[in-house]
Amino acid sequence: MRSDGLRLTNIFLIQTLGSVQNYSALPQPSSALKRTSSIGYQNPPFTSQHTRSMSLLNSASRPQQPNFQRSSSGGAFGADAGLSSVRRSVSSNIFHGASVGRPSYAPGSLSASSASQSLQRRSSVFSRPSVGGPMGHQSFFTQVPNAAGVPRDPRPLRDRSFQARIGQELLEYLTHNNFELEMKHSLGQNTLRSPTQKDFNYIFQFLYHRIDPGYRFQKSMDAEVPPILKQLRYPFEKGITKSQIAAVGGQNWPTFLGMLHWLMQLAQMMDRFVLGEYDEACAEMGVDVSGDRIIFRFLTGAYHDWLQGGEDEDDETAEKRLVPHIESMAQEFERGNEKYMQEMQVLEAENRALRDQIEELEKNAPDMAKLDKHFRILEDDKRKFEDYNQNVQGKIEKYENRIKFLEEEIQKVEAELQAAEEERSSLQSSVDQQGITIQDIDRMNTERDRLQKSLEDTTARLEETHARVMEKEAEASRKLEDLEEIVKVYNTLGYQTSLIPSTAVNAKGQDYELSLNINDNSFSASQIGGLPNRISSEADRLLAEPFTGYHPAHLLNLDLRGMVRSSLQALRKEINERRKRAIDDDLERRNLLDNIKEAMDEKRSEVEALEHKRRAAEEEFERLKEITTTQKLASDAQIEKMEKELAKMRATLSESVQLMEQREMNTNIEYEQLTLRANALREELHTNVESMLNDVIRFKVHIQKGLEDYESFVVDEVEQELGGDLPATKDVTSQT
C-alpha cells in the first residue's frame, strides 16, 4: 500500500488543509471554529449572515482535521512521503498545540497562522477557487467586476410575454425539484403572477438552498436577501432595496421575478457543473478541471471517513482509513495520465509526419531566392499594369463623354438645318404663290431698312427712358428702405414705451404698430405691356398696380396725423403728470435719505468709539493669548509626558489583559476538566455509596437473620430447660 501511495508523485500537489480554506459544504470541527469572545479575530466577510448549521458546529468532541502535506515542487514525495503525508503531526497541523499526541482543543492554543487561516474560511461553496493551488491561467467561471453605479437590467422584465415565459420556466424547475415536498408549501399556476410575501420567501429559500445547502436563514428576508445577492454578485442587486423586499408584489414583482429566474439559472449551472457538463467547454478554454474533481472527491471522501473516527483513535488507524482514498485517487490520476499519454503519442506522430513532409518539400522545392526574385518582378509588373489600366480607363471615360457631347451637338445642328430647310421651302412656296416681282422685293427691302432704322432710334430713346426709370426706381427703393427703417425704429420705441402690441399697458386696447402696405405681387410681361426686360422684378414692390404707384395715405396702415398723434399727445400729458408725481416722491425720498445719512453719521461716530474699545480689547486679548500660549506649551509638554506614560501603562495593561485572558482560558479549560473529573468522581462516589448501602443492607439482613436464628435457638433451649413453662418464656421473648 505504501508503494501505491508513492505512485502519486509527479501527478498532483496536496496542500495542507490548514491553508486550504473551507470551500466544501462539509462542517468544520468545533476545534477549527474561531471564538470571538476570547480571541480578538475579526469575522471573515459575509460570515455574520452566512451561518452554517449549528447542530454540527457545536459538537465539542469532534476530532481535528487531517493534515495533508506535499512538497513545494512537482517532484517525488521522497522515501517518507507515503502514508506519512497524511499523518496528523503536531508541527504542521493548523492547531499548533501541545507537544505530543492530538493537539489541545483550547482556543488559546491557536497560533497567528491558524488565526489567519480561520479568517479565510469560505462563505459559500460556489465561490471556492481550485484546491489544486494557484494556477497560471484565469478561472473559466471568473466574473468581471461590475461597473460603478446602478446598472440597468437589459431584460424586458415589464413585458408580459417575457414574464410568462420565465415564470413558467421557474415553475417547472420548482416542480421537477420537489419544491412542495421540501418546503411544505403548495404552488399554483397564478403563484408567479401575483405572489404573496410568503411565496417569495419560500421560493427564494429553496433556490438558495439549491446553491448552498448548508445555509440557514436566521433573520428576516429583508436582512438576509441583500447580503446574499451581493455575495452571489447579482448584477442588479443595487436596484433592490429592503423596502421592496418587504413588499414584493405589485410594481416590484417583475424585478424580483427576474432575480429568482437568475438564481434558478445559477442553480442549474451549478448542477451541470457538478455533473461535468462544462468540462469540455473548460478544456476548450484551456482550463483542465478533471484534476480538481479528483482531488475534491478524495478530500470529501477522506474527510468523511476521517470524521467517523473518534477522538481516541490513534494515528495508525486514521492512516489506514485514508489508504483506500489515496489508492483510488492515484488510479484516477493514472487513468487521466494514460489518456494524456495517448493524446501526446498521437500528436507526436502527427508532428513527425509533418516534419517529414516539410523536409521532403524543402528538398524538392526550387531555389527560394530565385522564386522570391521572380515573385518581386511579377509583383512590379502587376503594379505597372494596374497603373496603366487605371490610366487607360480614365482616358476611355473621357473620350466616351466627349463622343456623347459631339453626338448631341451633331443632332442639334442637324435639327436646326432641317428646320432652316423647311422654313426656306415654305418661304419659297409662299413667294411663288403671291407672285411678287423684283420691284416689289426692292421696295419691301427699302421699307424694311427704314423701319429698322426707326426701331433703332426708338430703342435708343427707350434705353434712355429706362435708365431714368431705373434711377427713379433706385431712389424710390432707397426712400422705401428708409421708410421701413423708420417704421422699425417707431415699432421698437413703441415696444419700449409699452405702446405695442394692443395688449400693452399704455396702448389701452389700440393698435399702434405700423406696417407698410406694399404689394408683394410680381407683375407679368402681359400686365406691363409685354416688356419683361425693361422693368426689374425688384421694382414690382414699388407699384400698387402695373403702372401706378402708392398714394402716401394708403402706404401706412395707421393715420399718423390724426388718431395716432392725438393718442400720443394724450399719453405724453399723462406721462408728464406721472413724472411730476415721481419727482415729488423722489424729493420726499431724498429728504428721508438725508435724515438717514445724518442718523448713520451719528451711528458711525458710535461705531468708531466702539472700534476704539475693540482695539483695546484686542490688545488685551493678544496679551492674554500670549499668556495662554505659554501655559498651553507647558501643558502640552505635560500632556505628552502623560500620554507616553499612558501608552506605557496601556501596553502593560494590554499584556496583562492578554495574560489574564490566557489565564482565563486556561482556567476555563481546567474548570471544564475539573467539572468532568468531578462528574466522574461523583459517579464513582455514587457507585461506592450504593455498594456500601447494599453491603449495609445485606449485613443488616444477615444480622437480622442471625438474631432470628439465635432467638429460635434460645427459645428451644429455654423450652428444654424449663419444660412446660412455655407461657413465661413467650412473655420474655415478646418483651425482648
Curated annotation (Swiss-Prot):
Disulfide bonds: none annotated. It holds the Pfam family Ndc80_HEC. Residues 327-492, 586-690 form a coiled coil. One of its GO terms (cellular component) is nucleus. Residues 57-76, 105-138 are annotated as: Disordered. Residues 57-70 have a biased composition (Polar residues). The keyword Nucleus applies. One of its GO terms (molecular function) is microtubule binding. It is found in: Nucleus; Chromosome, Centromere, Kinetochore. Keywords: Cell cycle, Cell division, Centromere, Chromosome, Coiled coil, Kinetochore, Mitosis, Nucleus. InterPro entries: Kinetochore_Ndc80, Ndc80_CH, Ndc80_sf. GO terms for biological process: attachment of mitotic spindle microtubules to kinetochore; cell division; mitotic sister chromatid biorientation. Residues 109-124 have a biased composition (Low complexity). Component of the NDC80 complex, which consists of at least ndc80, nuf2 and spc24. Acts as a component of the essential kinetochore-associated NDC80 complex, which is required for chromosome segregation and spindle checkpoint activity. Belongs to the NDC80/HEC1 family. This is Probable kinetochore protein ndc80. The lineage of its organism: Eukaryota, Fungi, Dikarya, Ascomycota, Pezizomycotina. The gene is ndc80.
